[in-house]
């Protein structure tokens, strides 16, 4: 979230791991939240 991170690529060697961690958790979370929310409307 710091501006100009592309200016210092050496300062972010863990960018790939961070990206995988964020998306690996965010994608299933959004999916389950959407599924649960849709189920609430489908049941009633």
Swiss-Prot record:
Membrane topology: Single-pass membrane protein
Residues involved in heme binding: 23
Subcellular location, record wording: Plastid, Chloroplast thylakoid membrane
Alphabetized Pfam families for the sequence: Cytochrom_B559
KW Transmembrane (keyword) present: yes
Keyword 4Fe-4S in record: no
The protein's required cofactors: heme b
The entry's keywords: Chloroplast, Electron transport, Heme, Iron, Membrane, Metal-binding, Photosynthesis, Photosystem II, Plastid, Thylakoid, Transmembrane, Transmembrane helix, Transport
Free-text cofactor note: With its partner (PsbE) binds heme. PSII binds additional chlorophylls, carotenoids and specific lipids.
InterPro entries assigned: PSII_cyt_b559_bsu (IPR006241), PSII_cyt_b559_CS (IPR006216), PSII_cyt_b559_N (IPR013081)
GO BP term, pick one: photosynthetic electron transport chain
Recorded GO CC terms: chloroplast thylakoid membrane; photosystem II reaction center
Transmembrane segments: 19-35
Molecular function terms, GO-annotated: electron transfer activity; heme binding; iron ion binding
Function: This b-type cytochrome is tightly associated with the reaction center of photosystem II (PSII). PSII is a light-driven water:plastoquinone oxidoreductase that uses light energy to abstract electrons from H(2)O, generating O(2) and a proton gradient subsequently used for ATP formation. It consists of a core antenna complex that captures photons, and an electron transfer chain that converts photonic excitation into a charge separation.
Record-stated family: Belongs to the PsbE/PsbF family.
Assembly notes: Heterodimer of an alpha subunit and a beta subunit. PSII is composed of 1 copy each of membrane proteins PsbA, PsbB, PsbC, PsbD, PsbE, PsbF, PsbH, PsbI, PsbJ, PsbK, PsbL, PsbM, PsbT, PsbX, PsbY, PsbZ, Psb30/Ycf12, at least 3 peripheral proteins of the oxygen-evolving complex and a large number of cofactors. It forms dimeric complexes.
Protein name: Cytochrome b559 subunit beta
Source organism per UniProt: Porphyra purpurea
């Amino acid at each position: 979230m710091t501006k100009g991170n592309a200016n210092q690529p050496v300062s972010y060697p863990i960018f790939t791991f961070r990206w995988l961690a964020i998306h690996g958790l965010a994608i299933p979370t959004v999916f389950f939240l959407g599924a649960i929310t849709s189920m609430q409307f489908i049941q009633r």
